Amino acid sequence: MGGEQEEERFDGMLLAMAQQHEGGVQELVNTFFSFLRRKTDFFIGGEEGMAEKLITQTFNHHNQLAQKARREKRARQETERREKAERAARLAKEAKAETPGPQIKELTDEEAERLQLEIDQKKDAEDQEAQLKNGSLDSPGKQDAEDEEDEEDEKDKGKLKPNLGNGADLPNYRWTQTLAELDLAVPFRVSFRLKGKDVVVDIQRRHLRVGLKGQPPVVDGELYNEVKVEESSWLIEDGKVVTVHLEKINKMEWWNRLVTSDPEINTKKINPENSKLSDLDSETRSMVEKMMYDQRQKSMGLPTSDEQKKQEILKKFMDQHPEMDFSKAKFN
């Protein structure tokens, strides 16, 4: 049987036919067999039973393909659900973990002296390493770069530094993100195990609400950008933490906040390596990798990938036309 392109050859025509059949697939199939009966010798042209045999074989072939596609789709969905659950569990565990309280231990004078000496030695070693790494003298180019960095820092003054998940740790909840998705963990200090009936989670295309029933919501505001509601989900972890998974519509941007009422994070300090490029489709992944490469090139004062292509084309053209004088030409 034909390949995928051959199969799709008549899709436009058949789709137009299907749209004119109000009775759906059953009416479309009836029309097709009516055509075979009236305009061809399909039913009577061959040996007895051949037409029925061909129909059965064709049906079985496409039924097997359909069942295989359904199994593969279910397997993909199950894998995605499992990965989301594992990711949500990790996020909930991090949100639930409490920093242990400081333990007070009385030191003797000798122990205190030794501890202070170790601290001083460690600090001196770090300072020396930093000096060796950076050099004792600042070059003019380095000074300009530092001035530019100071200027950028001034613009971003007051913004939060992203957490390890490229999101933010706020007083009442924690969120992390990749370019494609965002995960939120909201811990609740309750004396009982939470159930679905105890919480309110409302995920809309541009709005999110999370809280306990009968209580003011912990999260209630307009999202930074739109999400795919049908691909987003939530669950309760360990009976205490509500985790929400949001699928971004725009998979080429970092959110600087979860909802518009949140404090901003400094997206310039986001570490793209913490995001799983493997989670993205091939087209989006290649675009992200190109964006990251261009960003590194710009930071080093080197041409981007597009600029490199232009330079290669120009060089090739110049090599092909040695008779032309480009010495006075100006290129942008």
UniProtKB/Swiss-Prot annotation:
Motif Nuclear localization signal: chain residues: 68-74
Residues where N6-acetyllysine is found: K240
Region (Disordered): 65-108, 123-171
Chain residue ranges for the region called Interaction with EML4: 174-332
Residue numbers of Phosphoserine PTMs: S136, S139, S261, S275, S278, S286, S299, S327
Primary site of residence: cytoplasm
Modified sites of kind Phosphothreonine: T108
Coiled-coil spans in chain: 60-134
Comp. bias regions, Acidic residues: 145-154
Function: Plays a role in neurogenesis and neuronal migration. Necessary for correct formation of mitotic spindles and chromosome separation during mitosis. Necessary for cytokinesis and cell proliferation.
Family indicated by similarity: Belongs to the nudC family.
Name of the protein: Nuclear migration protein nudC
Organism in which the protein naturally occurs: Mus musculus
